[in-house]
Amino acid sequence: MSIVPVVKQMITLSLLMLTGFFANRFGILGRDAQKWMSKLIINITCPALILSSVTTSQRLENNQMVLIIFGAAIAYYLILPFLAKGCALAGPRNRRSEYTCMLIYSNLGFMGIPVANAVLGKEAILYISIFMAIFNISIFSYGIILLGGTGGGKLQFKKMINPGTVSAVAAVLLYLGSISIPTLLLEPITAMGNTTTPLAMMVIGASLANGKVRDLFTEKSMILFTVLRLLGLPLLAWGVCQILGVQDRLLAGALILISGMPVASNTVMLCTELNRDGDYIAKGLLISTLASVVTIPLISMLL
């Protein structure tokens, strides 16, 4: 894939993030506004984007491919924890759970879907949606155990049923059943979904303004983590696709992009819910988000 269109898309996304950054600095998009905008994106606009994109995208050659994507997603979230635990050994002993969590869970909703839509086209959103469904099951089961310690975290099955998971499953069912959404409903759903990318990028930019950016890159272990998160994992995913001979361009592209996304914002929310200090993960989220502006065009060259 040519890097030029990817760079153009990342410049667009960066300008949107910059808008959010300055909106925060000028008191327009403060912490409270970021919270309600995040809820709006997670609960309304992102599910709308998933539904509209999947139902209007070009169909795959056969439905068997959907099962293959599900299998790939399940394998991804079963194997990655073992790799992440091994990589986390390079970090501080008291932060290994956080490192493991940050390496496993990437930002699929806020950045994965918008970037995949921009880089691979809306056909790729079906792939990301399936990964999102497995992601939600994983983070609200293993993620809670990981951050909650040996006895502090309990599985929260209700948390697995959320707008992101429901819309992802609904989109797959609509796709498999060749069911079309009536135009009267599809047009407003599409309009809402189209706001996801600008809103999400602005919220991410605003969150970057909450801390001191200059202090983020002073910790060596965090820099190592950022390299692993944004370059090491996507290179590994690319290598696995080459070894296994993955022919489907969108599946390989989705795997590589998902592996190279910054830390998921859900991890910080989990820390808050489990009464665990989330500042360290928030730091990893900010660093990886900033660095991804440069690394995403680089890994896109592998697609």
Stretches found by the model and what they are:
Residues 1-303:
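Alpha-helical transmembrane segments of multi-pass small-molecule/ion transporters
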